[in-house]
From Swiss-Prot:
GO (cellular component) term, any one: myofibril
Subunit structure comment from the entry: Homodimer.
Coiled coil, from the record: 37-860
Similarity remark: Belongs to the paramyosin family.
Taxonomic source organism: Onchocerca volvulus
UniProt entry keywords in alphabetical sequence: Coiled coil, Cytoplasm, Motor protein, Muscle protein, Myosin, Thick filament
Function: Paramyosin is a major structural component of many thick filaments isolated from invertebrate muscles.
Skewed-composition ranges (Polar residues): 860-869
Region listing for Nonhelical region, in residue ranges: 1-36, 861-879
Stated name of the protein: Paramyosin
Keyword Signal: no
InterPro entries, per the entry: Myosin_tail, XRCC4-like_C
Length: 879
């Protein structure tokens, strides 16, 4: 029973046909192509999801089977217990029945769950089988598509390979054709551009030189005018300084007079105090006298008769004393009025001097402002003059370089014209030779016809021909000996070329030694200039330290000595003069430094020109050496090829006509380019700043000309080969027509000798050109090194000049600080003038108080006179 419960029909799922389909998947995947990997990955993902669902269903089935097994175990245990408890009571029977009923329910539930699980497993199995069938069908379709795609891909690959081969061949042909076309176009365009650029550059440089000369003359005139104005301003400054000194002397005289007046005023005040004390004493004595008089009035009546004479005498003494006092008072008043007049005169003189001092201070400030403005203008003018000098030097250097380039370009143009004329002459010579060869060909054809007509006669003369053949064999041996001689000459030429190379290397070593010596000299000059600059810098530092100490001492004196302000101001003016002189000295030293810098720049320009010339020579030497090596290799190749080349006379004629047409087309294009170059000769404005680029282009053009000469050499060699071919054909024609071809052979031999002489001349010129190119290449390298060293020296000199300018600016700033100190001193002078005015105001107040005292004194004197008169009148009445 348990065995039947444990066995489930779902176990057959593991042996379903879908698993066989899964087992066939790797083989199917192995035959897949790369194009179907995306669809296969999607199918694999779906299969993986289905497998995960299947695993979850398996786990659920196993769990249900475990629960069923547990329930079956419980059922077995319950049945055992039931069998053990059959002999128990009815209650146990009822309980057993209940348990059996529960077991029946559990069995039903278990069977229902099994049925549901089996249904679900069947549904899942069907779904899985359907999905697997769909996937297998899709995989088969994909395999079919993949096979079709593979076949199509192989076919397309074959087609692509064929097409790429065809395209490569077409591209090679096209590239070769484009190279040939571009080469010819580049030659014509570069020659025309070179001619027009050089002509435009020459015209522009001439115009620019004229314009710069005019600007230089204008600037020199302006500099002269500015110098005249500066001299006038310095003269005005000197006059203002003299006026200021005179005003200061007047101010000092006024100060001395004022101090004397103050002393006199003090003395007058002392005298006034003494007069006041005397007046007080007299008033006290008067009060006592009045008191005594009041006391004596009581006794007058008693002593009237007795003292009449005495009273009269006393009255006369009082009158005398009053008269004396009035006289003294009048004298004092006259002295006070004289002093007041002097004080008013001094005040007027003081106000006049003060106004003059203020005017002079204003004039001094204006003069200082104008001096500062003129100094700034002078600095700006000096800067502009220096900039213009630098610009003029640069332009002169550029002008010289452009002139040199123009001369070189004109020489190159002349060479090109000569080459062109030579090419025209060669063309004409080739045309004449072509005509001669055509005539020779016609004659050879006629001779061949004659030979055909006389063929039967030649058969009779076979024996004679055999002898002539032997003679021709001997001639062939002689030609072989001549060929060996030519090979020996070629070997000797190679040996001479090797010797020339050794000589060029030796000269290059000598030039390098000269360059090293020049570099050492330049280094010594740089060291000397740096030492001079260091000395100048040390002197300037010492001068600045001395001026700093001096300024500090002057500041301390100005702070400590307020009373001696005028003397300090005079000393400050003297120091300003000294500083201006020192500034002039510094400016002179700066001008010397600038002159040295200018000399260095001139040396730099000269060295740069040398570098450019040497670099050009070095480049030419290099190109000549390369051309010599290539010519040697080409000569070897041509020597090897010349031994086995045979062509027809008709092909030679066709080649010559083609060359003639080609030369005519090139001549027409060159003539058109030359016309365009003459038309566009005046249309370039920006060639002055591209001197080095023009030099590089000139070198490239030189390379191109060398390539052109190489092409001409190749053409010449081809013509020589054609001549050799003509010789071979002439020999054949001689074999065919012995009698008619001797004249043609003689003509061709003369032509061969002419061509050999031309070849020797051309090789000699080629060797000379190579030697010149090597020299120019070596010279270019040496000059390039000199240019680099001179550029470094220029940078160092520029740095030192910048440092000197910074130091000069620092000294100017210190001079401005000294001027600010003088302005502070002037402000102190004005403050003291204000204090002096306040003191004068106080003196005016004292004078006004003195007037009040005088008025009171007069009023008191008049009152005393009136009182004495009334008393006398009373005494007379009493009498």
């Amino acid at each position: 029973m348990s065995g039947s419960l444990y066995r489930s029909p779902s176990a057959a799922l593991y042996k379903s046909p879908s698993m066989s389909a899964f087992s066939g998947l790797p083989a199917a995947f192995g035959s897949m192509s790369v194009a179907d990997l995306g669809s296969l990955t999607r199918l694999e993902d779906k299969i993986r999801l289905l497998q995960e669902d299947l695993e979850s269903e398996r786990e659920l089935r196993n769990r249900i089977e475990r629960e069923r097994a547990d329930l079956s175990v419980q059922l077995i245990a319950l049945t055992d217990r039931l069998e053990d408890a059959e002999g128990t009571t009815d209650s146990q029977i009822e309980s057993n029945r209940k348990r059996e009923a529960e077991l029946q329910k559990l069995r039903k539930l278990l069977e229902e769950s099994q049925l549901e699980n089996e249904d679900a497993m069947n549904v899942l199995r069907k779904k899985h089988q359907d999905a697997c069938l769909d996937y297998t069908e899709q995989i088969e379709q994909l395999q079919k598509k993949n096979s079709k795609i593979d076949r199509e891909r192989q076919r397309l690959q074959h087609e692509v390979i064929e097409l790429t081969a065809a395209i490569d061949q077409l591209q090679k042909d096209k590239h070769l054709a484009e190279k040939a076309a571009e080469r010819f176009e580049a030659q014509t365009i570069e020659l025309s551009n070179k001619v027009e650029d050089l002509n435009r550059h020459v015209n522009d440089l001439a115009q620019q030189r004229q314009r710069l000369q005019a600007e230089n003359n204008d600037l020199l005139k302006e500099i002269h005018d500015q110098k005249v104005q500066l001299d006038n301003l310095q003269h005005v400054k000197y006059q203002l300084a003299q006026q200021l000194e005179e005003a200061r002397r007047r101010l000092e005289d006024a100060e001395r007079e004022r101090s004397q007046l103050q002393a006199q005023l003090h003395q007058v005040q002392l005298e006034l105090d003494s007069v006041r004390t005397a007046l007080d004493e007299e008033s006290a004595a008067r009060a006592e006298a009045e008191h005594k008089l009041a006391l004596a009035n009581t006794e007058i009546t008693q002593w009237k008769s007795k003292f009449d004479a005495e009273v009269a005498l006393h009255h006369e003494e009082v009158e005398d004393l009053r008269k004396k006092m009035l006289q003294k008072q009048a004298e004092y008043e006259e002295q006070i009025e004289i002093m007041l007049q002097k004080i008013s005169q001094l005040e007027k003189a003081k106000s006049r001097l003060q106004s003059e001092v203020e005017v002079l201070i204003v004039d001094l400030e204006k003069a200082q402002n104008t001096i500062a403005i003129l100094e700034r203008a002078k600095e700006q003018l000096e800067k502009t003059v220096n900039e213009l000098k630098v610009r003029i030097d640069e332009l002169t250097v550029e002008l010289e370089a452009a002139q040199r380039e123009a001369r070189a370009a004109l020489a190159e143009l002349q060479k090109m014209k000569n080459l062109y004329e030579k090419a025209v002459e060669q063309k004409e010579a080739l045309a004449r030779e072509n005509k001669k060869l055509q005539d020779d060909l016609h004659e050879a054809k006629e001779a061949l016809a004659d030979a055909n007509r006389k063929l039967h006669e030649l058969d009779l003369e076979n024996a004679r021909l055999a002898g002539e053949i032997r003679e021709l064999q001997t001639a062939l041996k002689e030609s072989e000996a001549a060929r060996r001689d030519a090979e020996n000459r070629a070997q000797r030429a190679l040996a001479e070329l090797q010797q020339l190379r050794i000589e060029m290397e030796r000269r290059l070593q000598e030039k390098e030694e000269e360059m090293e010596a020049l570099r050492k000299n330049m280094q010594f000059e740089i060291d000397r200039l740096t030492a001079a600059l260091a000395d100048a810098e040390a002197r300037m530092k010492a001068e600045i330290a001395r001026l700093k100490k001096k300024y500090q001492a002057e500041i301390a004196e100005l702070e400590m000595t307020v009373d001696n302000l005028n003397r300090a101001n005079i000393e400050a003016q003297k120091t300003i003069k000294k500083q201006s002189e020192q500034l002039k000295v510094l400016q002179a030293s700066l001008e010397d430094t600038q002159r040295q810098l200018q000399q260095t720049l001139d040396q730099y320009a000269l060295a740069q020109r040398k570098v450019s010339a040497l670099s050009a020579e070095l480049e030419e030497c290099k190109v000549a050496l390369d051309n010599a090596i290539r010519a040697r290799k080409q000569a070897e190749i041509d020597l090897e090829e010349a031994n086995g080349r045979i062509t027809d006379l008709v092909s030679i004629n066709n080649n010559l006509t083609a060359i003639k047409n080609k030369l005519e087309t090139e001549l027409s294009t060159a003539q058109a380019d030359l016309d365009e170059a003459t038309k566009e000769l005046h249309a370039a404005d920006e060639r002055a700043n591209r001197a080095l680029a023009d030099a590089a282009r000139a070198v490239e053009q030189l390379h191109e000309e060398q390539e052109h000469s190489m092409k001409i050499d190749a053409l010449r060699k081809s013509l020589e080969e054609q001549v050799k071919q003509l010789q071979v054909q002439i020999q054949e024609a001689e074999a065919a027509a012995l009698l008619g071809g001797k004249r043609v052979i003689a003509k061709l031999e003369t032509r061969i000798r002419d061509l050999e002489t031309a070849l020797d001349e051309e090789t000699r010129r080629h060797k000379e050109t190579q030697g010149a190119l090597r020299k120019k290449d070596r010279r270019i390298k040496e000059v390039q090194m000199q240019v680099d060293e001179e550029h470094k020296m220029f940078v160092m000199a520029q740095d030192t000049a910048d440092r000197l300018l910074e130091k000069l600016n620092i000294q100017k700033r210190q001079l401005g600080e000294a001027e600010s100190l003088t302005m502070a001193n002037l402000q102190r002078v004005r403050r003291y003038q204000r204090e002096l005015e306040d003191a004068e105001g106080r003196a005016d107040q004292a004078e006004s108080s003195l007037h009040l005292i005088r008025a009171k004194h007069r009023s008191s004197v008049t009152a005393g006179k009136n009182a004495s008169a009334s008393k006398i009148y009373v005494l007379e009445d009493d009498q």
